[in-house]
Regions:
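Long, positively charged amphipathic alpha-helical accessory segments at protein N-termini or as interdomain linkers
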Residues: 9-10, 25, 77-106, 116-259
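N-terminal lobe of the biotin/lipoate ligase/transferase fold
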Residues: 1-101, 122
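Short loop/edge segments at beta-strand edges and connector loops
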Residues: 18, 108-110
Length: 259
């Protein structure tokens, strides 16, 4: 697999590939081979992925050379395993806040898809390796639709930044901005001593959620229902209130939005 040209001034360790099966798999293998010598925020990008995956095992459609397909690694050994959802929050917030530069209609669909209106612009898959009661390694795999004009898969609701704005965008510039935002959030987590920074992240995440107001349709193992969002717990549990006033609490993959 060949390397793609990338800016000489890119501010983070970067491996730019033309094609790979999965950037998550690539960087995971790299970490296994090199262990601690893989620096924080080392990033692998690809112009095309042959087996990119999403949260539910879905493939991610991305036209070659048009989008951002990348994975980066963190070593959050200071974070207890029970707090791992905070990593999902800072990654999704970093992407959402970068895309906010072009639209005020960007939201986070729990747990960490990024939406513009009712359309998906970004998918995120985070894989954490635990070391005892702490997180030894966290790899975030991300696909963002940037400059793609048309989508041909059976994905129901994709959209790209170009479709939103009508113009082409510099993918490396967007990537560097996202990583900088992640770094700022991550450094804040490393240095906090009272939990106030975590609380601020949780509050920002709550304000950014898709369909955070009003009643909307959902589906769980028992069927379809209408509910409103109450809160997302710090461990990532999704809490809804249905039309009968009953609270319903869900872990990942236990409930789906009906779009």
């Amino acid at each position: 697999m060949s390397m793609k040209p990338c800016p000489e001034t890119f501010p983070y360790p970067l491996i730019a590939l033309d094609e790979t099966d999965s950037t998550n798999r690539y960087i995971s293998q790299l970490c296994n081979e090199l262990q601690e010598s893989v620096a924080e925020l080392t990033t692998v990008t690809a112009e095309f992925q042959t087996a990119g995956k999403g949260q539910r095992g879905n493939t991610w459609e991305a036209e070659r050379g048009k989008n951002l397909l990348f994975s980066f690694v963190l070593h959050p050994t200071f974070l207890e395993a029970r707090r791992q959802f905070i990593l999902s929050q800072i990654v999704s917030l970093s992407i959402k806040e970068e895309l906010d530069r072009w639209s005020d209609e960007i939201t986070i669909k729990w747990p960490n898809d990024i939406y513009w209106r009712d359309k998906k612009i970004c998918g995120i898959l985070i894989e954490n390796d635990l070391s005892g009661h702490f997180i030894g390694r966290s790899i975030s795999g991300i696909g963002i639709n940037i400059n793609q004009n048309e989508f041909h898969s059976d994905a129901p609701n994709p959209v790209s930044l170009k479709q939103i704005t009508g113009q082409e965008h510099d993918r490396y510039e967007i990537l560097s901005h996202i990583l900088k935002r992640v770094q700022i959030y991550y450094n804040g987590l490393q240095t906090e001593d009272s939990g106030t920074y975590t609380a601020e992240i949780t509050a920002r995440y709550a304000r950014s959620l898709f369909r955070r107001r009003g009643f909307h349709p959902y589906e769980d193992a028992g069927g379809k229902f209408s509910a409103r969002l109450l809160r997302v717990e710090q461990d990532g549990r999704f809490v809804l209130e249905d039309e009968n006033g009953k609270e319903r609490e869900y872990l990942f993959k236990e409930v789906q939005y009906i779009i």
